[in-house]
Amino acid sequence: MQALFIKISGRVHGVGFRYFTYKLANKMKIKGYVRNAEDGSVEIHAEAPEEILVEFLKAVSIGPPMATVISVKYERVAGQNFTSFDIVP
């Protein structure tokens, strides 16, 4: 199991980005969370096997149709053994 912290910038608030990420993560059996950050970005903590995280990262780098992704930054982090994937306020 691997873990990534992903920060996505651009037009990502108010366009369904968190819900898109939530649905995708649950479909791919990824654990963690997604939240809107105060700086206008979206932050994601994702835990899954490496090959699944690679595909997830590709998908969230595009985002939902109304989003405009400008920047995607990610780093490997320690897993926190989440049991679900949640939208965090």
From Swiss-Prot:
Disulfide bonds: none
Pfam families reported for this sequence: Acylphosphatase (PF00708)
Domain spans labelled Acylphosphatase-like: 3-89
InterPro entries, A to Z: Acylphosphatase, Acylphosphatase-like_dom, Acylphosphatase-like_dom_sf
PROSITE patterns in the cross-refs: ACYLPHOSPHATASE_3
Keyword Hydrolase attributed: yes
Hydrolase recorded as keyword: yes
Family label: Belongs to the acylphosphatase family.
Protein name per UniProt: Acylphosphatase
